């Protein structure tokens, strides 16, 4: 079954590489946010206040936001062309056949260039999709860019080393997207947390 899927995937990649990457990243991005929302909603509903008679006071439990899932799907589609071309450039400039040092070069460049770009792109895209405009995107980046990038540097160098060392080009994005399911859960929760903090600040001001 897996070999059949891999054959079809490779055929699709040969025919339309960028579209294949967009579909892969968009699908896995949507899955990651759906899981993140599920975890958040489960915890929120579980901790809902219960009256003395044992009746739950929260009669309107939270439900998943389809809009937020679609924001992750569209983000995956939007960033994939940039990410695939970036990976293809690294593969061409630093071929693994010329030694392990090229893996190190790829990882260092990836973390120095694409990690900051991807982080900024993510929060900007999400904030604009929420209708908060460029000023809102700027404020969001001011609040969460550096903490998120620091967290990125604790996680991604290891996985990108494995990725660049073991995976051929057509599987590098799927591998990264699979790891990114867990990373996007973190980003999704971070983004939602930032939105809640922003909302609470507005309530205090007015």
UniProtKB/Swiss-Prot annotation:
GO biological process terms, alphabetically, are: mitochondrial transmembrane transport
Tell me which UniProt keywords the record has, alphabetically: Membrane, Mitochondrion, Mitochondrion inner membrane, Transmembrane, Transmembrane helix
Its placement in the membrane is given as: Multi-pass membrane protein
In its UniProt entry, the species of origin is given as Schizosaccharomyces pombe (strain 972 / ATCC 24843) (Fission yeast)
Where does the sequence pass through the membrane? 107-127, 169-189
Q: Where in the cell is it found?
A: Mitochondrion inner membrane
Q: What domain of life does the native source organism fall in?
A: Eukaryota
User: Mind telling me what this protein is named?
Assistant: Protein sym1
One MF term in the entry's GO annotations: channel activity
Would you identify the family this protein belongs to, as annotated? Belongs to the peroxisomal membrane protein PXMP2/4 family.
Q: What is its main location?
A: mitochondrion
Q: Which GO terms describe its cellular component?
A: cytoplasm; mitochondrial inner membrane; mitochondrion
